[in-house]
Amino acid sequence: MSVVLLSMACSKTGLSGADGGAGTAGGGSAGTGGGSVDARPESGLKLVVEVPATVNRDLDLLFVIDNSASMASLQAKLIASFPTFMNVLRGLPGGLPNLHVAVISSDLGAGAYDSADIPGCRHHGDQGIMQNAPRGKTCSTGSLNGGQHFIVDGDGQRNYAGTLEDTFACIAALGDQGCGFEHQLGSLLRALGADGNGGPPPENYGFNRPDAVLAITILTNEDDCSAPVESTLFDPSSRYVADPLGPVSSFRCNEYGHLCGGQKPPRNADAELSGMCTSVEDGTLLRVADVAKALKALKPGALEDVLLSVIAGPPNPYNVRLTAPVLADDPSLWPSIDHSCTAADSSFADPGIRVKELADAFGGNGVFQSICGSSLEPASQRIAEEIGRRMEPTCLTGISDAQPGTPGFQPDCQVVDHFGSAFSGQSDVPLKTCRETKDVAPCWYTDAPTTDCVSGALKFLRPADRGDLRSTTFTCNP
């Protein structure tokens, strides 16, 4: 976690007055070479958080975009919402982070079978390679063409012409000719070299920086169908409803990827299964738990630096519906899954069981938003705000309001700045609230409370020269 140093123009809420009430770093003694602060152990104070002084400004954004049939209009919605996404990031204290931005498709083909067997499923698909050339529209990516496979913008460097929004629009319009057996999770693992195959594709080298926050966003209107490379799940020789694998359709992914009330979704009957379905973790498809584990392992010791967001169909309602026969030589009714949502523009999505479970596996670092709406701006804004929180101050959690009758949130905390190092000598200096210092730096305050941070995010006023400030600790009454 990191904090952002703000100007003195910010509004401050939820602080105590200068009378030694809540929020005061009182009773401490400042000094050099090992000064100490009274921890008031009798009050039951506990260390809530230690906030590093160094702000992490590196952010790697990876968009996994479904490019199968019916996705073109939804890609257009994502592109239209991208300026909103970027405005949130540009509005962060300190401005736009140092960005890497990449786009991959959901197309890994259909195992050992290619387009001669399954239309649209080229052998191995895009292999998780980050895209650097337009597909679904006429545009220019500037110097990305023939060069790097991801956008770079930060530290005074950029590798594209025009605006970042226009460049993203150029590479994010992937079209809708990709394989209908979507491999969102498999493509994601392949792109980041987390699939156990010896690293990412050469085109992707340099994207995932070790110390950067990694924010992944999956956009899809169907659930994931990622299977092991050796899988026969997509065998096109099974084409009739009565065949072992059933017809060559996306229902195969539901039948072998979901478990509803302990049973597979039925192939031969209508069924209403809302609230009953989960992913199957028997290895037919990549296990969601294994995918989450592999992604978290990319940032060992810093799980908060991986954010996994999904924009997809909600998992419910979940209904199996038999429709008219599709094959001329098979009179059987064709199994399908009803859409779980439909937008006013007739775009739709099916239940995203597996992708929702992946987002859930990241707990507070996971976001799930419905893809069905007149606009994706609300979803993009929510995701960008969650990313921003990881580039901004920490939220105090596990503590109560010391003055619940007063507007805002008044934490009862001792706050201490830690300077120096083991080599140069260390000192601990109490840090007062900005109300106590009348907004004279250095001081601290909490931002306005939100539903996601009831205490209000931690904020600081600092002089331009912070010396050798190492970190700041908050020790608070629970």
Name what the model sees in each region:
Residues 15-39:
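Short, low-complexity, disordered segments immediately C-terminal to signal peptides
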Residues 11-13, 37-478:
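Divalent cation-coordinating acidic motifs and surrounding scaffolds
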